[in-house]
């Protein structure tokens, strides 16, 4: 392991794309799960100052997930068990009225003649669409590549590739619409993420499987939350209203709903809402399709 770590430290030093280099190098040196989990600290120990400084800017949990994936293991060990649990769990709706019982339309980011979600013209366009089609909700798609994610917060020191694939499902509705908890749990974090095109008001809930495996749900682009960190939450309980432009990061009013199987090295009230296209299998293990919880018919995601 020491020789491998030394070799990897050399390959990563000066590499344009750390993720790409890790995956390529480890394809020739498959490791056990225990070895994969232990590798990153060994690389740091063998690295020179410039590489250590670069690694310090990145999420160590995500790098370990990349290493695990490159070695043929599940990026997140408990992800499959969490997804299996959710397939059979009883869930409440995440908004009121219940999206499962309400007419809706798909809002792929490249929908013809649709203004961008960050363009204030979207509101009038969507209001007209809702009135014309007699429906309440619009859905932004999980796993969709979006051109809007070009701001600096979607890039990092790993390399030139921005994070551009959406890790949640968006539910567009009027500001003030009630956002509710689908599962029992506790409030993990309440935060205001103020950067332009960030989440604005954000709530993260912590849940657990019957075997005690933790997982989380994230609610972004809210109005002022009705809950506080540490609160116990019941299914159907109101978390917050849907936020408007001035408080939700600068987006047309909508809920970003995301399932998270590992918080990686993130300890605050924010989490990655988009992932690298080239590493989609890793990101899909971290944040699987949240329709496991929403239970919306697949037809609503198609035009």
Regions found by a protein language model. Give the residues of each.
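Short beta-turn/strand-loop junction motif enriched in small, turn-promoting residues
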Residues: 176, 190-193, 243-246
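Acidic, glycine-rich catalytic/binding loops that coordinate metals and/or anionic ligands
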Residues: 85, 94, 98, 228-247, ...
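Generic structural motif
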Residues: 171, 177-187, 233-236
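A short beta-loop-beta micro-motif enriched in histidine and acidic residues
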Residues: 165, 173-175, 198-200
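Short, conserved secondary-structure segments in the cores of folded domains
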Residues: 175-178, 223, 229
């Amino acid at each position: 392991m020491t020789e491998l770590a030394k070799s990897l430290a050399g390959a990563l030093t000066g590499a344009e794309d750390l993720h790409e280099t890790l995956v390529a190098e480890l394809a020739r040196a498959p490791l056990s799960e225990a070895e994969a989990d232990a590798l990153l600290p060994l690389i740091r120990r063998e690295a020179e100052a410039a590489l250590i400084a670069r690694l310090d800017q990145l999420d160590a949990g995500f790098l370990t997930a990349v290493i695990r994936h490159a070695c043929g293991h599940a990026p997140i060990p408990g992800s499959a068990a969490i997804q299996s649990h959710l397939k059979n769990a009883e869930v409440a709706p995440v908004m009121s009225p219940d999206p499962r019982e309400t007419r809706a339309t798909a809002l792929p980011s490249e929908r013809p003649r649709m203004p961008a979600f960050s363009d204030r013209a979207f509101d009038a366009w969507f209001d007209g669409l809702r009135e014309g089609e007699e429906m309440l909700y619009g859905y932004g798609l999980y796993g969709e590549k979006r051109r809007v994610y070009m701001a600096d917060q979607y890039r990092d020191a790993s390399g030139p590739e921005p994070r551009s694939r959406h890790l949640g499902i968006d539910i567009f509705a009027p500001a003030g619409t009630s956002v509710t908890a689908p599962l029992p749990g506790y409030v993990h974090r309440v935060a205001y993420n103020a950067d332009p095109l960030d989440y604005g008001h954000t709530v993260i809930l912590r849940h657990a499987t019957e075997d005690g495996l933790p997982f989380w749900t994230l609610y972004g682009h809210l109005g002022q939350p009705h809950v506080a960190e540490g609160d116990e939450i019941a299914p159907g309980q109101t978390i917050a209203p849907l936020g408007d432009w001035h408080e939700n990061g600068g987006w047309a009013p909508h809920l970003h709903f995301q399932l998270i199987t590992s918080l990686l090295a993130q300890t605050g009230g924010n989490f990655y809402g988009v992932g690298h296209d080239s590493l989609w299998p890793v990101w899909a293990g971290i944040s699987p399709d949240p329709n496991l919880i929403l239970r919306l018919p697949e037809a609503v995601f198609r035009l």
